[in-house]
UniProtKB/Swiss-Prot annotation:
Active-site residues, as the UniProt record annotates them: K162, E252, C286, E464
Catalytic reaction annotation: betaine aldehyde + NAD(+) + H2O = glycine betaine + NADH + 2 H(+)
Pathway: Amine and polyamine biosynthesis; betaine biosynthesis via choline pathway; betaine from betaine aldehyde: step 1/1
Gene name for this UniProt entry: betB
Cofactor note: Binds 2 potassium ions per subunit.
Organism encoding this protein: Pectobacterium atrosepticum (strain SCRI 1043 / ATCC BAA-672)
EC id: 1.2.1.8
Residues found modified as Cysteine sulfenic acid (-SOH): C286
Keyword Magnesium assigned: no
Protein name, UniProt field: Betaine aldehyde dehydrogenase
GO molecular function annotations of the record: betaine-aldehyde dehydrogenase (NAD+) activity; metal ion binding
Record-listed NAD(+) binding positions: G150, A151, W152, K176, P177, S178, E179, G230, I231, A232, S233, G254, C286, E387
PROSITE patterns named among the record's database cross-references: ALDEHYDE_DEHYDR_CYS, ALDEHYDE_DEHYDR_GLU
Amino acid sequence: MSRYGLQQLYINGAYVDSTGNDTFDAVNPANGDIIACIQSATAADVDRAVSAATAGQKVWAAMTAMERSRILRRAVDILRERNDELALLETHDTGKPLSETRTVDIVTGADVLEYYAGLIPMLEGQQIPLRDTSFVYTRREPLGVVAGIGAWNYPIQIALWKSAPALAAGNAMIFKPSEVTSLTALKLAEIYTEAGLPAGVFNVLTGTGKSVGQALTTHPGIAKVSFTGGIASGKTVMANAAGSTLKDVTMELGGKSPLIIFDDADLDKAADIAMMANFFSSGQVCTNGTRVFVPKALQAQFEEKILACVQRIRAGDPTDESVNFGPLVSFPHRESVLRYIESGKREGARVLVGGEPMTDGDYAQGAYVAPTVFTDCRDDMKIVRKEIFGPVMSILTYQDEDEVIRRANDSEYGLAAGIVTRDLNRAHRVIHQLEAGICWINTWGESPAEMPVGGYKHSGVGRENGVTTLEHYTQIKSIQVELGEFRSVF
């Protein structure tokens, strides 16, 4: 028997068996152990979930704002009480270090839920006077049933980022986690039910994008899809949403983000920022600053500092709390990252450190790749153009500000960007010219609940977090009231 046993679907407030017979395994990427057997949902299960969500949403939306807020706040309390248990499950499922999952994944997800629980009472309409005898008022009403489709890198955090604003606005959600990391989304469903969420308001359907995702994005009973994943899949989701019932969509589709270090920067700080922007979570972060631009005159000095920082990486068993660098999420993904590394070598980039799988001793059974830094990179290289989603930094040199801005923007992506400088005027001047939705000055990576996040260009549509996201889970109804006479032209 695997550690976590058989995992069912979660529909209408309870675990239920799939109507089909297909299952798939959850694998611990640190050692290759099968930790759970997970049932795959079918199109019939999607129908069941939509029916349950439709009924549950009516109950949920009829509650007062304060009633909904209290239930979501209870869920926040339970998440925090169970933080260590959920963090260990996330570590087993994703390979992320326990030092990370205990302090980031559940913590930041709970913060977002608490933020939206507090915003529920502010979902207000407007009153617009027209004349003495007539006025208009507006109502913000929920969309109904919405779907969330998650990525594998931040399973429970993404489930919370998507469900928190949706539920706060009075909607019901059907959530499909990535088939690579499905386990904590199911636990979140349990927690919502324990907190008092009506049956059917949050459902979890496990399975592949081609089956479950396809059925969700084309289902006529779903009003909106929020998706996190790759560009190709995002285009499919958007086409399905438009081709079925003109569903609203929110998408976060990844990036190849630039980090620009200017000649006045504190290079020790710049190196620390570059390390966080490339090797946190073993490089599996959508916003990673993998294109690191350094003035040509500072290249050698910066490389020395990066090499010193790499020595502080502590790879190993992710359940060891002294470890800060774990395996990649899966063995197939490790092979994908290694192919990118080999392409970098073939195209002439110089390996400063790493560039190989980690296969000795304790690493032999896991999906480990050594932290890798390429230098002498060119803009046309595959490792510079494509999202690798692994621990691979590319160092590029530049001569002047105009050049680096142009090259930083020369990408189909536009998710994030950052600069390191002591010059406040330059900081704002450059940031305002960078084509990215999330920008950092002298820092990297923080995405607090209050901050809207999302991309330009092919990196996404819409935003997550912040007040604006809550508004996009509602629709505005306008009502005109006439207190005086009505005169017909007929």
